[in-house]
């Protein structure tokens, strides 16, 4: 892998060096052709020895320059220049043709991007002062889509009549409802009371000592326990009847029923029979 990478790098740099050499040769050829054109232009004046200079520089018309006469100047000079210029230009064009094609191929293969350096040191920056109205106007001009949506589509001339352009009447906002909050009663600090106990006011009654011998406060499971009347028992007797012994009521009811049966004269018929027997006897 290392050898292949080195070969690829060597090939890359070799191609780059070839490209630079070809660019230098093409620049030299262009400079030579430019110099030949300038010398030909200088020797085209009539009456001065232009043919001699042109023949010496081009190398093609040396014989023409030596055989020309100084007296006639205009015709010989023009003939020498035209011949020299034609040969030199055609020769330069022929030599520059294949080199130009090779350069274009290399440029297509390797394109080097040279960033252009721009000097901004001479710029003078000033503080921008733009009002808000101008900003809004510029935004409206730059964003026609927003105006299209807000205005219902385009300008007034572009609007078309139809059911889709009917604007709904603007409804007035409802009046704000004022909610009156009832102030909560002041709570005593340090004591928590549930909501149910906050509203009810309880009066504290004087509470005496507990009645130890009362069955209501201290009920006993013994059937032979003595019942001691207390103040609460007396108060309860005033309102309703207190049943102290479960069998007493039944005994009283049975006695009453027995008395009622005894009060009935069940032997009245027998007594009449006795009286009748006594009479017959």
Curated annotation (Swiss-Prot):
Polar residues compositional bias, start-end: 214-225
Post-translational modification: Isoform 1 and isoform 2 are phosphorylated on tyrosines by ABL1 in B-cells.
PTM-bearing positions, type Phosphoserine: 8, 131, 155
Phosphothreonine modifications at: 4, 205
InterPro entries linked to this entry: CDV3
Keywords from the named record: Acetylation, Cytoplasm, Phosphoprotein
GO cellular component, one term: cytosol
Localization, UniProt: Cytoplasm
UniProt feature, compositional bias: Basic and acidic residues: 1-15, 103-119, 226-254
Endoplasmic reticulum among keywords: no
Gly residues bias locations: 46-97
Protein name: Protein CDV3
Region (Disordered): 1-257
Compositionally biased spans, kind Low complexity: 27-45, 157-170
Residues bearing PTM N-acetylalanine: 2
Organism annotation: Mus musculus
Family affiliation: Belongs to the CDV3 family.
Domain of life, source organism: Eukaryota
UniProt main location, coarse: cytoplasm
Tissue: Ubiquitously expressed (at protein level). Up-regulated in ventricles of juvenile visceral steatosis mice.
Residues bearing PTM Phosphotyrosine: 120, 213, 267
Primary gene name: Cdv3
């Amino acid at each position: 892998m290392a050898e292949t990478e080195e070969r690829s790098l060597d090939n890359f740099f070799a191609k780059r060096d070839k490209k630079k050499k070809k660019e230098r040769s093409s620049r030299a050829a262009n400079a030579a052709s430019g110099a030949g054109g300038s010398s030909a232009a200088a020797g085209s004046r009539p009456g001065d020895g232009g043919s001699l200079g042109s023949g010496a520089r081009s190398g093609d018309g040396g014989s023409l320059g030596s055989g020309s006469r100084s007296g006639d100047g205009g015709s010989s000079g023009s003939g020498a220049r035209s011949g020299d210029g034609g040969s030199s230009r055609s020769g330069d064009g022929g030599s520059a043709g294949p080199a130009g094609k090779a350069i274009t191929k290399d440029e297509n293969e390797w394109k080097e991007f040279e960033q252009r350096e721009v000097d901004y040191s001479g710029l003078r920056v000033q503080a921008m002062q733009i009002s808000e109205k101008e900003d809004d106007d510029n935004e409206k001009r730059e964003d026609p889509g927003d105006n299209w949506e807000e205005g219902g589509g385009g300008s007034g001339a572009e609007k078309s009549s139809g059911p889709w352009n009917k604007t709904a009447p603007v409804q007035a906002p409802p009046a704000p409802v004022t909610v009156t909050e009832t102030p909560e009663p002041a709570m005593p600090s340090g004591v928590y009371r549930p909501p149910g106990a906050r509203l009810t006011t309880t009066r504290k009654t004087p509470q005496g000592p507990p009645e130890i011998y009362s069955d209501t406060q201290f009920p006993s499971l013994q059937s032979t326990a003595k019942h001691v009347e207390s103040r609460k028992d007396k108060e309860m007797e005033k309102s309703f009847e207190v049943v102290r012994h479960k069998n007493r009521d039944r005994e009283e009811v049975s006695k009453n029923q027995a008395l009622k049966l005894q009060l009935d004269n069940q032997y009245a018929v027998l007594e009449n029979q006795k009286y009748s027997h006594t009479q017959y006897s």
